């Protein structure tokens, strides 16, 4: 009886729901196209297909007859009759049409009677029999959507352009309308139809003219959409049209409907077409298309007097025609349909646009004097600039709370993530079995890399991931237990099975997978490094970061099971905080990266768990580690807090940045760098903080440079950019000036729309930037985004922070951000407190010298330090870190000094392990990027786009070696290692576009797969000895051919069964897209002569290969490399590079490199023509000795360098290639000679060799004078002789000259004029003179003749071929005269350099004619490269050009001026007091040398020098130098513990420990004494009056009048007592009160002590204002009317009384807070009104709505009470009454 009553109630309710429907809206009745008592029969066809721009189409078709019976108003019965369905995958003449011979099959479970509820022409709901599956329901919804015709005003969007005339049946209006694809804005047009409509509707030609109605859907404005997405790149628009500059159109989607209907009905014809366009690889011109078309045409309209069709059993209601994923009914929550268009679309802003100053200013101008009013207890939505730091956001419609499916439970897989089609919510028993089968298959394939591309290893891995993703917790746990046994197996295949499964679980991204990983770590199945690599991938793979998961992950990262494991502890913490940023803090990624359209936002936007739980915990951890001075952990916590990217991290970091908590400069720099995540959100607060830091010149420069590098991420305002441009002129720090210039100039070149504002502001400031040139060692930031409209390769950023103690940077960072990357991807960063000290520490850990010096020096460095009270700088703790974000692994390896000690121990232990043999097996499979987007199309089937970049790294090795460290018995490091390596790296770029045919469960798709694989299967051996390195390589499998490189591109069309376990490429139904003709092909073998055969084979149909050089046009190498892996013209491509081991007779290759130097060589004779060598064997000591003797012939005290390279191919017939070169010169001889030998020794091809000799004579050098070299000719004759074959030879004779023209140009150059002015003041070696002297020794004319004998014909026209090459390149003006010939066998060359024009001209005269190439560009550093100037070498001059003279800096003690190492020049004439030129005392680690150089002038034109030097090898010397008197030589007195080996024109002392000269000195021809200590460690030139010292050591450690050598001129004001401002005080401060010192100098020294002040850092306040100024700014600020919300006060007093102003405490609620005023505010009672208003600034205090006290205060206020509150106040504006009136 109960069941009967319940059934009756349900029937009554159901019938009432239908019968009560009125076909009217707002009192107006609208006709329905369906008339009661009529039966309508339609012919229905539907097709959905996918296709590329060429090739086959893959799809399905459906047809049936559709009958509609109208039994009562608003209620229809409908039925599909004879439904049929077919699939196809074939080439079609028109890719959108169907095959003519398509075979249809009956479609079950869809021909049931169902009911439709309508309101006019609008579909309200449907009732389906429960026997109709949900996929068939969605198909029916797609058909019904095509018939929906609603011209009523229901949900019309208010817009002045809307119009509709019901009488005329014409109009155009926008409204919100629901169909199967979503509830979105729809544009209706109603218009008459052309007279030819009868041809289209022949059956109804006699009816009255129909009306044409068209509908177009705007998917950018929806109240609800049914969609699933994951991993969508930043700025990629797929829901609508990309309008903003920060957006790129990822997917183009459109739905268009056309309906022909009678004025009173019926609908004669209805067509709906959906198109989706997307490039399979995200961006590009050649889009794939998914096309869906529904066609319904009326066959007949008949009277229907028959009985209703009986229901087919129980019915299931569908409340809308939206696409469904289950039978469960969800509830819509969207705003009123009558709201305006501006209020219907709640748009999130992109991070790139968030709070941008340009937009803020525009809004401000529009809203000037227009305050927003709200009553005190209501929330007013603020401008974006007032939102939280994370409110960067997403595309439209995110406010919708409509949920399509429930978020998966912690134990459930993600059903919707697979195909966005209804799934049975139960485990498939075969999942585990199938997973194990695939695991076994691909683990076996991994052992044979040659077949991996063909067997499609990576595609099968993603099938495995799909299977794992479909498992519940229980099933996954069972599967894991069955595979975990393979983890410890010695079997390689089983071990690979475990590692592949482990990575498959990591990539699955489901909640059961996350739970399984936790279980592995807790049960120690994976530990330390292995566990770390798993955990760090989770932020990019976890698809459902709910609050529960994020807090669970964070707590897990801090649990003992994790914190006690090396590598895992830091990695887990960073992974957890990164996930929290992506899933909660960053509103943009929280919406766009995760499937919010399917499940709604996964965490509440205003949930305070980050502020209440996560951040306080991390802040406390950081505070504790700082108190314990644990730098290693502090770096990790700083990075983790920075990862959160919440604005509140500024408060956490403030005490450390402000100096209230003392930390090292390194950690402060680390904090500033880790503000980048917040800066990416364009947060204006962090932008203000960064700008304040970079503007604070009292901050340490590393902190300021880090702020500059981060502020460009936040997109600084135009005013900030202009201020920074001005700073490039006047900032005291060269590092700051350098990085600002490079950042502004590179930002101005950016082209990507996402960088539009940054580029524009930089372009406006670029012309304000200084022209000062900075060295490459200085801080810089370079940004490049190679972009065009259809191809977005990515962004490349390189930056570093310069060092004061090294040319190596303190911080070096490279970032590549791919088109699919949401975060910085492939980031490598190395950071040091001091790179120099770090390297010294590692070096000394292996070899720590402890020299002992028994002899006391007259003025040692130690003694000088005591005399002048020089104290070594207090060194900050040695700290370092390496940050890597690669393979989706974000890793931070931080070090302190104690960690480095452990590191050296670890290295030593590993070396011991290697000596007994070490094996390594590593496999890592991961998805570098993945994007999934799914949504329904017109047919009711889900469109599916999936992009993945699966990659694998497989590494197997065996290493055994022996190491010998320097000792008493052996002074050299030696090593001998043998390593077997099998290394494989493969990556697929796999894009797939299609749809799921839910009727046949067939997945129809098209796509493109790019495959790249590298395979290195070799055995390596390396031997290191003194001066010798020997490298041996041989195939690991000599009996197998090996594919070393594979590259292919496969466009295809496919049709696969759902959940197929077969890779698409291996499915027989898959069809490859091919073209008729190949663009390029290769089939060649190389290396036959060496018997090591390399085979290149392949082809391509892509037109990209017609101009391969076009791929190398970018400014950076990364972009050029990335372009090789992408195709603009997608076409079948296949290339292999193979090593044919079976055909190669050579089974091993040995490469030997030998280098040595010989000093003081004395050999009589002269260098003769080249002759053949008798010894052709590799690494021949005999040949080297012979060549050393020959090349040093005739050179006085020659120094000879020898390089010997050889390559030996070993096999049945050995093949040897040898290259030996020697070079001889001498500091006391002008001759320079060289020899070259190149030979081959082959058993099959015989012996061949080429010999060459070279000789030149250096011109006269004037080291300290600019005028003298100009007074004499600069000429350097040279000659070369080549001998090859039996009688072939080439002779070259010519000279380098300086022309009179160039001499005149030099004399008139501004540089020369500056030098002349300095010379008149007796200053010969200041900056301008140094540069001028170098240029004066540079030749500008080279002329030589080449004569040849028995030259092969192909070389005789060398000049002509060279000329044609230049002409082809087209860079320069070229001329040719084929009539002007030289004699056979001779060529003449003339090269003229114009250094000031930066061009050169080449004239070539040959037997083929004369050619001239004019005005070819030449590098600016050419004079240095060609200059003969000494004592600097050519490469040092070039390096100095690129480093601002800091590679080999110099200091000159000139006549009246001193030029410091850091390029500061100041006036100071030396007195008779000894002055410290340089002083550097040895430290405990890293610097074991001691140096002291003193200088004084006993007379005005005579300078005396004293040098004290002690080396790390235990050698020491003292040198006392006095100027020459009359014709006598310089008086040089040397006291040393080394042995003198020569003592005439070149004096040399020998270091027996290092086996090299310890001291050399000689007097040059120009009368300059040249000193060389420890083989160029210190060089000096001296002419009796002036002294110049060159050295690149002692950076930032030396003290004296030559400065600190830090590269910063501002450092050259620091004396032992502090900073002084006057140059005479600075120099006098380094004078000694010894040996008859000058009284005046001592007076200046005493004055310097009095005036000195110590440098002091003053740290930056972080967003701190005093209360008075803050209040004044609020009340007096110009933007007070527009800057914030204005609240309206009210009185809560319930007792009516006289209308007068009452004082009442006010409250309002804002998001998750309750805010209460700290004082009473004027207000009027509710029965009164205000006579006038004013704006009053009031302090308020806010706390969470969960706060018990504030909830109580709110209730008291509502009762009229006035509670007192306390807390941190902020100032808000209230609109208060001046008077109250009745």
Curated annotation (Swiss-Prot):
Query: Does Disulfide bond show up as a keyword for this record?
Result: yes
Where is it expressed, tissue-wise?
Answer: Detected in oocytes (at protein level). Produced by the fat body, where it is cleaved before being secreted into hemolymph. Sequestered then by a single class of receptor mediated endocytosis in the ovary.
- Region Disordered: what ranges? 333-367, 379-406
Which subcellular locations apply to this protein? Secreted; Cytoplasm; Cytoplasmic granule
What is the protein's given name?
Vitellogenin
Q: Locations of Basic and acidic residues compositional bias? A: 344-358
Gene designation per UniProt: VG
Q: How does it assemble?
A: Heterotetramer of two heavy and two light chains.
- In which organism is this protein found? Bombyx mori (Silk moth)
Q: Where is the VWFD domain?
A: 1449-1638
Q: How is it modified after translation?
A: Glycosylated and phosphorylated.
Q: What does this protein do?
A: Precursor of the egg-yolk proteins that are sources of nutrients during embryonic development.
Q: Name one GO cellular component term.
A: extracellular region
Signal sequence: where?
A: 1-15
């Amino acid at each position: 009886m109960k069941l009967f009553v319940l059934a009756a109630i349900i029937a009554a309710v159901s019938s009432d729901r239908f019968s009560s429907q009125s076909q009217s809206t707002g009192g107006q009745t609208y006709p329905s196209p369906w008339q009661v008592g009529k039966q309508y029969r339609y012919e229905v066809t539907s097709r959905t297909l996918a296709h590329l721009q060429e090739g086959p189409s893959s799809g399905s078709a459906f047809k049936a007859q559709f009958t509609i019976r109208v039994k009562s108003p608003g209620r229809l019965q409908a039925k599909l009759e004879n439904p049929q369905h077919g699939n196809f995958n074939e080439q079609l003449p028109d890719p959108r049409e169907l095959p003519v011979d398509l075979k249809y099959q009956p479609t079950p479970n869809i021909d049931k009677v169902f009911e439709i509820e309508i309101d006019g022409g609008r579909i309200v709901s449907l009732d389906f029999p429960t026997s109709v599956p949900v996929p068939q329901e969605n198909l029916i919804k797609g058909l019904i959507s095509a018939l929906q015709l609603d011209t009523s005003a229901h949900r019309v969007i208010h817009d002045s352009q809307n119009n509709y005339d019901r009488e005329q049946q014409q109009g155009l209006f926008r409204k919100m309308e629901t169909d199967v694809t979503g509830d979105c804005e729809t544009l209706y047009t109603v218009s008459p139809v052309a007279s030819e409509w009868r041809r289209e509707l022949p059956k109804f030609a006699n009816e009255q003219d129909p009306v044409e109605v068209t509908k177009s859907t705007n998917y950018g404005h929806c109240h609800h959409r049914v969609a699933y997405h994951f991993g969508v790149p930043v700025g990629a628009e797929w829901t609508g049209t990309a309008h903003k500059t920060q957006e790129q159109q990822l997917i183009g989607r459109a739905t268009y409907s056309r309906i022909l209907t009678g004025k009173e009905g019926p609908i004669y014809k209805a067509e709906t077409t959906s198109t989706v366009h997307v490039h399979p690889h995200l961006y590009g011109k050649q889009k794939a298309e998914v096309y869906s078309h529904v066609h319904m045409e009326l066959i007949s309209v008949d009277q229907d007097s028959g009985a209703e069709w009986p229901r087919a059993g129980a019915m299931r209601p569908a409340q809308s025609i939206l696409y469904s994923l289950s039978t469960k009914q969800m509830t819509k929550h969207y705003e009123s349909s009558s709201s305006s268009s501006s209020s219907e679309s709640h748009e999130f802003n992109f991070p790139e646009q968030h709070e941008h100053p340009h937009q803020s200013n525009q809004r401000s101008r529009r809203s000037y004097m227009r305050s927003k009013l709200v009553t005190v207890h209501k929330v007013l939505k603020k401008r974006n600039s007032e939102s939280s730091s994370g409110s960067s956001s997403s595309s439209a419609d995110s406010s919708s709370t409509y949920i399509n499916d429930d978020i998966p439970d912690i134990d459930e897989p993600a059903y919707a993530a697979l195909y966005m089609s209804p799934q049975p919510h139960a485990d498939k028993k075969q999942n585990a079995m199938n997973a194990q089968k695939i695991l076994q298959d691909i683990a076996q394939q991994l052992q044979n890399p040659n077949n991996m591309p063909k067997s499609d290893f990576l595609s099968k891995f993603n099938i495995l991931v799909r299977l794992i993703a479909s498992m519940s917790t229980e099933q996954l746990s069972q599967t894991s237990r069955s595979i975990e046994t393979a983890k410890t197996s010695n079997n390689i295949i089983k071990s690979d099975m475990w590692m592949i499964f482990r990575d498959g679980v990591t990539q699955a991204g489901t909640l059961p997978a996350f739970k399984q990983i936790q279980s592995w770590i807790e049960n120690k199945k994976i530990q330390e490094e292995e566990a770390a690599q798993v955990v760090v991938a989770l932020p990019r793979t976890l698809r459902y970061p709910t609050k529960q998961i994020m807090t669970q992950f964070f707590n897990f990262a801090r649990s003992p099971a994790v914190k006690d494991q090396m590598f895992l502890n830091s990695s887990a913490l960073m992974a957890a905080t990164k996930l929290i940023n992506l899933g909660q803090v960053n509103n943009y990624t929280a919406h766009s990266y995760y499937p919010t359209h399917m499940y709604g936002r996964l965490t509440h936007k205003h949930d305070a768990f980050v502020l209440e739980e996560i951040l306080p915990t991390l802040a406390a951890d950081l505070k504790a580690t700082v108190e314990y001075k644990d730098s290693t952990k502090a770096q990790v916590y700083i990075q983790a807090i920075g990862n959160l990217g919440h604005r509140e991290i500024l408060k956490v970091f403030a005490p450390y940045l402000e100096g209230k908590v003392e930390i090292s400069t390194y950690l402060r720099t680390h904090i500033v760098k880790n503000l980048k995540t917040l800066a990416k959100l364009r947060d204006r607060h962090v932008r203000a903080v960064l700008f304040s830091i970079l503007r604070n010149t009292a901050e340490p420069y590393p902190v300021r440079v880090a702020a500059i590098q981060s502020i460009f991420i936040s997109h600084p305002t135009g005013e900030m950019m202009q201020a920074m441009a001005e700073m490039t002129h006047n900032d005291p720090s060269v590092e700051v000036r350098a990085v600002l210039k490079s950042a502004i100039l590179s930002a101005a070149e950016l082209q990507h729309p996402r960088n539009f504002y940054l580029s524009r502001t930089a372009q406006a400031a670029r012309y304000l930037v200084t022209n000062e040139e900075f060295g490459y060692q200085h801080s810089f930031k370079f940004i490049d985004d190679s972009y065009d409209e259809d191809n977005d390769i990515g962004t490349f950023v390189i930056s570093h922070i310069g060092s004061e103690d090294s040319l190596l940077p303190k911080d070096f960072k490279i970032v590549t951000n791919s088109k699919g990357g949401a975060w910085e991807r492939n980031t490598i960063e190395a950071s040091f407190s001091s790179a120099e000290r770090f390297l010294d520490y590692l070096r000394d850990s292996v070899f720590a010298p402890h020299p002992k010096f028994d002899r006391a020096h007259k003025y040692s460095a130690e003694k000088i330090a005591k005399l002048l009270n020089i104290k070594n700088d207090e060194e900050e703790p040695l700290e370092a870190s390496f940050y890597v974000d690669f393979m989706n692994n974000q890793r931070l390896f931080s070090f302190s000094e104690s960690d480095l000690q452990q590191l050296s121990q670890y290295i030593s232990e590993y070396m011991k392990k290697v000596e007994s043999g070490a094996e390594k097996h590593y496999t890592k499979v991961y998805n570098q990027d993945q994007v999934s987007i799914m949504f329904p199309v017109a047919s009711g089937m889900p469109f599916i786009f999936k992009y993945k970049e699966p990659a694998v790294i497989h590494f197997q090795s065996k290493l055994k070696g022996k190491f010998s460290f320097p000792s008493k018995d052996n002074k050299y490091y030696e090593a001998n290692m043998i390593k077997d390596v099998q290394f494989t790296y493969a990556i697929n770029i796999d894009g797939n576009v299609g749809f799921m045919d839910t009727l046949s469960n067939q997945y129809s798709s098209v796509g493109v797969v790019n495959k790249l694989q590298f395979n290195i299967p070799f055995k390596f051996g390396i031997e290191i000895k003194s001066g010798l390195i020997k490298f041996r390589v041989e195939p690991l499998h000599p009996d197998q051919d090996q594919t070393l490189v594979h590259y292919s591109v496969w466009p295809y069309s496919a049709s696969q069964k759902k959940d197929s376990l077969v890779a698409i490429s291996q499915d027989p139904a898959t069809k490859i897209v091919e073209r008729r003709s190949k663009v390029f092909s290769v089939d060649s073998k190389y290396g036959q002569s060496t018997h090591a055969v390399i085979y290149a084979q392949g082809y391509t149909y892509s037109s990209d290969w017609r101009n391969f050089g076009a791929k190398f046009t970018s400014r950076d190498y990364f972009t050029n490399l990335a372009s090789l892996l992408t195709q603009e013209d997608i076409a079948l491509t296949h290339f292999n590079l193979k090593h044919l081991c079976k055909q190669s007779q050579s089974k091993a290759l040995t490469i030997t490199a030998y280098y040595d130097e010989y000093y003081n060589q004395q050999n009589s004779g002269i260098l003769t023509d080249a002759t053949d060598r008798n010894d052709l064997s590799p690494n021949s000591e005999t040949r080297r000795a012979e060549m050393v003797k020959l090349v040093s012939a005739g050179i006085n005290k020659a120094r000879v360098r020898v390089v010997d390279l050889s390559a030996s191919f070993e096999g049945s017939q050995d093949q040897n290639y040898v290259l030996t070169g020697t070079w001889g010169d001498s500091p006391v001889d002008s001759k320079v000679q060289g020899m070259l030998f190149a030979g081959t020794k082959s058993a099959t091809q015989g012996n061949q060799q080429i010999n060459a000799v070279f000789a030149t004579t250096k011109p006269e050098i004037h080291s300290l004078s600019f005028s003298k070299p100009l007074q004499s000719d600069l000429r350097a004759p040279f000659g070369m002789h080549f001998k090859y074959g039996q009688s072939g030879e080439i002779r070259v004779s010519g000279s380098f000259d300086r022309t009179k023209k160039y001499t005149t140009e030099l004399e008139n150059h501004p540089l020369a004029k500056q030098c002349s002015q300095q010379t008149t003041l007796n200053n010969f070696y200041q900056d301008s003179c140094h540069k001028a002297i170098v240029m004066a020794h540079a030749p500008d004319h080279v002329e030589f003749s080449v004569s040849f004998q028995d030259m092969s014909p192909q070389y005789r026209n060398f000049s002509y071929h060279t000329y044609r090459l230049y002409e082809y390149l087209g860079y320069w003006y070229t001329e040719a005269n084929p009539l002007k010939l030289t004699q056979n066998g001779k060529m003449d060359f003339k090269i003229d350099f114009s250094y000031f024009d930066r061009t050169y001209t080449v004239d070539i005269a040959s037997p083929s004619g004369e050619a001239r190439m004019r005005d070819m560009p030449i590098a600016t550093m050419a004079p240095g490269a060609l200059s003969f100037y000494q004592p600097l070498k050519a490469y040092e001059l070039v390096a100095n050009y690129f480093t601002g003279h800091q590679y080999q800096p110099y200091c000159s003690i000139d006549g009246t001026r001193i030029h410091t190492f850091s390029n500061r020049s100041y006036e100071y004439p030396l007195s008779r007091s000894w002055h410290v030129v340089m002083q550097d005392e040895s430290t405990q680690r890293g610097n074991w040398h001691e140096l002291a150089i003193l200088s004084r002038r006993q007379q005005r034109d005579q300078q005396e020098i004293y040098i004290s030097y002690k080396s790390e090898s235990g050698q020491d010397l003292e040198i006392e130098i006095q100027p020459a008197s009359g014709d006598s030589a310089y008086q040089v007195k040397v006291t040393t513990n080394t042995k003198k080996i020569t003592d005439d024109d070149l004096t040399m002392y020998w270091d027996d420990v290092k086996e090299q000269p310890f001291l050399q000195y000689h007097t040059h021809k120009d009368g300059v004494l040249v000193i060389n200590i420890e083989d160029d460690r210190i060089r000096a030139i001296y002419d009796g009056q002036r002294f110049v010292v060159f050295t690149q050591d002692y950076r930032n450690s030396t003290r004296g009048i030559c400065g600190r050598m830090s590269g910063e001129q501002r450092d050259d004001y620091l004396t032992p007592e502090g900073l002084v401002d006057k140059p005479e005080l600075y120099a006098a401060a380094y004078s000694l009160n010894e040996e008859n010192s000058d009284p005046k100098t001592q007076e200046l020294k005493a004055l310097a002590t009095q005036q000195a002040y110590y440098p002091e850092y003053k740290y930056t306040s972080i967003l701190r204002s005093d209360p008075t100024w803050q209040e004044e700014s609020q009340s007096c600020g110009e933007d007070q009317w527009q800057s914030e919300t204005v609240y309206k006060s009210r009185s809560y007093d319930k007792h009516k009384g006289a209308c007068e102003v009452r004082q009442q405490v006010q409250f309002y609620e804002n998001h998750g807070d309750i805010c209460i005023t700290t004082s009473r505010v004027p207000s009027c009672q509710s029965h009164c009104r205000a006579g006038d208003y004013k704006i009053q600034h009031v302090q308020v205090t806010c706390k969470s709505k969960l706060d018990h006290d504030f909830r109580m205060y709110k209730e008291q206020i509502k009762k009229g009470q006035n509670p007192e509150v306390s807390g941190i106040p902020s100032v808000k504006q209230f609109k208060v009454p001046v008077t109250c009136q009745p």
